[in-house]
Amino acid sequence: MTALWPRIEPLLDRVEKPARYIGMERGAQVPIHRPDAVSWLLVYPDTYEVGLPNQGLQILYEILNERDDAAAERGYAPWTDLEALMRARSVPFFSLDTHKPAGEFDVIAFGLAAELVYTNVLNCLDLSGVPVRAEARRDEDPIVVAGGHATFNPEPMADFIDAFVIGDGEEVVGDMTEVIGAWKRSGRVGGREAVLHDLSLIMGVYVPSMYEVEYDGMAIREVRPRYPDVPATVDKRTIADLGEWPYPKNQLVPLIEVVHDRLNVEIFRGCTRGCRFCQAGMITRPVRERPLEQARTMVAEGLKRTGYDEVALTSLSSADFSGIGELVSGIIDGQEEACGNVGVSLPSLRVDAFTVGIA
């Protein structure tokens, strides 16, 4: 492994908020990159302040590092001041945990929470020295993956991403690790085409290069799989029981002030409301609640580990959680499951579901 830290450190006294690029936060992991393990770089394509609190990245970070056949690190887009210095000195995009060059990972996975980060993805790839267009990548280049809500319309990024994860990622990353690991151990038999074909067989994974598109002028006439075993329609991946995935177990505590600077506990996923303006409420169905006792435990243990004095009970409509009253009162009233005097944040709270008890 090539450590970039000796080349990065001299640049940090010339940039704003150098702690963005140090790593080693409470909750961070320093994985061992064994030759037989699949190395993942999980990238939130925005600055550290915006990306670090992202629950999706933290969940996959823990899940992958619990596996014997995987090693996962984090990456965040550098601010323009450091980017200019990196380009001037030929310092590539790097991971935060060990400052390993991004191009040395087996997989670079981007979390696309919204369409406005698309250009940041391309910039990170360019900084990494990885060909921006998928068709130009060689066998030794990382597999470029994207997941998150924005991937439900993957086509704007289809020329740049090798594989999209549609839906929940908790199970998919394990399936992908097994496929990529088997390909590595085989000596990369069949080249990049072979591993992308095998990835396309995983439920919830869309590989654009496995499909041929026929046009009628500017309109699409037909989309055909290139192989008979590749699915014609990619179904989203959904975890059935949120209680089986009590993550993140060890939330990261940032080195500088970040957005959503508090403990975050997801109490349910999905939504029953069906608001027509809300993409997330449609694509994350069905509703899956976290068991009340598990939510209590995650709040109590999370507050003790992080030292936060505020917890956000996150969901698309937190007041619709069936045990919301008991959960909030347990935190505020200092019952056995609570952790003293802490504030409770209820994001996405609907007025028609707000009660005096919650207040």
Residue ranges: model-predicted function:
Residues 12-41, 48-49, 208, 214-264:
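N-terminal [4Fe-4S]-dependent radical SAM core
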Residues 42-46, 64, 253-276, 303, ...:
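N-terminal pre-triad scaffold of radical SAM enzymes
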